[in-house]
Swiss-Prot record:
Active site: D52
Organism in which the protein naturally occurs: Orientia tsutsugamushi (strain Boryong) (Rickettsia tsutsugamushi)
Name this polypeptide is given: tRNA pseudouridine synthase A
Originating gene: truA
GO BP terms in the entry: tRNA pseudouridine synthesis
Keywords of the record: Isomerase, tRNA processing
CDD domains: PseudoU_synth_EcTruA
PANTHER family for the chain: PSEUDOURIDYLATE SYNTHASE, TRNA PSEUDOURIDINE SYNTHASE-LIKE 1
Pfam family, one: PseudoU_synth_1
EC number(s) per entry: 5.4.99.12
Disulfide bonds: none
Subunit description: Homodimer.
């Protein structure tokens, strides 16, 4: 068995989300179908995060397994080692992990697999930006130490034609200072019940938010960055919706603590549109 780790970039606009569904085309379904077409094997993709319909990704991480060719006698070395270390030396020829990977048949070579799948994905707005053989111990979801998201807002009197379906347009001017002040009360380990969706299946509402940063460097675009080991369903979008209400003076900045401690979704702001959300990267 060979395990592959890939990084995926996609525009989520025309998809029903990451996960396979019966009511439309998902990113998982399309990727699995194209990988299977090239490798002639059925594959099951495991993702670091299951993004909703309309959510984009710059660095979604996935893993999948392929049944290796029977003559891969050095397969155990590939599966156990991630570094390009020396594994054997015969007749003055040194064999390394990287050289073993390059000797794999075409459909098992990570770079050739990536190139072929990217070709098959056209014209869909999905692309593999990297692909490598990793250890069998790697798990895209459970090995993750931190996940990073960003949310993009356009704050001006007219919407952006170019950024349609990629941002949330807010016409009235936002009080960004109040948004920044309020956001800092959410950093740390808290019960985020007030910011989780009713459909959230997480066993516990306790999450540790390590970063919220409101960036106005490119105003009228506002980018809000989030980092945490994991998130609740709709947690980022519900926080953004609440911060926007604070920026519009519909909620006072001081009320953010009351909302957090109330553990009541009805007290927080609306769920921000999926179009402005990006899954940026995963730390392992």
């Amino acid at each position: 068995m060979l395990r592959y780790k890939a990084i995926v970039e996609y525009d989520g606009t025309n998809f029903v989300g990451w996960q396979r569904q019966q009511n439309g085309l998902s990113i998982q379904q399309l990727l699995e179908d194209k990988i299977s077409t090239f490798t002639k094997q059925t594959v099951n993709l495991i993702a670091a995060g299951r993004t909703d319909a309309g959510v984009h990704a710059l660095g979604q991480v996935v893993h999948f397994d392929l049944i290796a060719p029977n003559n891969s006698k050095d397969l155990a070395c590939i599966n156990k080692e991630t570094d390009n270390k020396e594994v054997s030396k015969q007749n003055n020829t040194t064999t390394t992990i990287d050289s073993l990977k390059k000797m794999l048949p075409c459909r098992y070579n990570a770079y050739k697999l990536m190139s072929a799948v990217n070709y098959l994905l056209k014209p869909h707005r999905i692309i593999l930006t990297s692909c490598e053989i990793t250890t069998l111990q790697f798990h895209a979801r459970f090995s993750a130490k931190a996940r990073h998201y960003k949310y993009r807002i356009i704050n001006r009197t007219v919407p952006s034609v170019i950024e349609q379906n990629r941002t949330w347009w807010i016409k009235p001017p936002l009080n960004v200072i109040d948004m920044i002040d309020a956001s800092q009360h959410l950093i740390g380990k808290h019960d985020f019940t007030s910011f989780r969706s009713s459909a959230c299946q997480a066993k516990s509402p306790l999450k540790t938010l390590t970063k919220i940063e409101v960036d106005t460097t490119n105003y009228p675009e506002i980018q809000i960055y989030f980092s945490a080991p994991s998130f609740l369903h709709h947690m980022v979008r519900n926080i953004v919706g609440t911060l926007v209400y604070i920026g519009l003076c519909k909620i006072s900045p001081a009320a953010i603590k009351t909302i957090l401690f109330a553990k009541n979704r009805a007290m927080a702001g609306p769920t921000a549109p999926s179009s402005g959300l990006y899954f940026v990267k995963v730390d392992y």
